[in-house]
A protein has these predicted regions:
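Cell-envelope and extracellular/periplasmic
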Residues: 1-161
């Protein structure tokens, strides 16, 4: 059995607080029931999944998509997110539950905090230094790609401030 969580659910991830939490990915086949848990640093269970849905596929050898649901959680962390069945376990470390902000747009959303060589942002260096005081701030950048079909995952990871 092999679980693969979507890249958004990697080490250092931030999950939205006070809202139902959904975790998804794919698996080859499942031995028993899929169970997911959120554990604190002392391995105490903070939350256990309340529902798991498996996609029905015609080809029995094709990977199946799964969706795991947790009840809303308060802000906190760092946690470990474990997804397992009777045969294997996948663990994601340094997971926080907090505020998730999504910024999207066109080329203007790619401008770095410091600006560009001939278009600097006033006070940027001070803001960048200040961000280092808050290691819980995370950033997940979805790389640009062109595709004729919907893309379900991307090859990237969470970064600390």
């Amino acid at each position: 059995m092999s679980f693969v969580l979507a890249d958004i659910f990697g080490d250092g991830a931030v999950l939205q607080r006070d809202k139902t939490i959904f975790v998804h990915g794919t698996c080859d086949k499942v031995e028993g029931e899929i169970v997911a848990r959120i554990l604190d640093s002392k391995k105490k269970v903070v939350a256990t999944s309340v529902k798991t849905k498996m996609e029905e596929v015609e080809d029995k050898d094709a990977p199946k998509r799964f969706l795991i649901e947790f009840e809303a959680q308060k802000a906190g962390g760092p946690y470990t997110l474990e997804v397992s069945d009777k045969g294997s376990t996948v663990s994601i470390k340094k997971v926080y539950i907090g505020e998730v902000w999504v910024a999207g747009g066109q080329s203007n959303m790619e401008m770095p905090v410091g600006g560009y060589m001939y278009q600097p942002v006033d006070g940027a260096l001070e803001h960048i230094k200040e961000a280092c005081k808050y290691p819980e701030i995370r950033m997940f950048t979805v790389p640009r790609c062109t595709s004729q079909t919907p893309v379900e995952d991307c090859d990237t990871m969470w970064r600390e401030s």
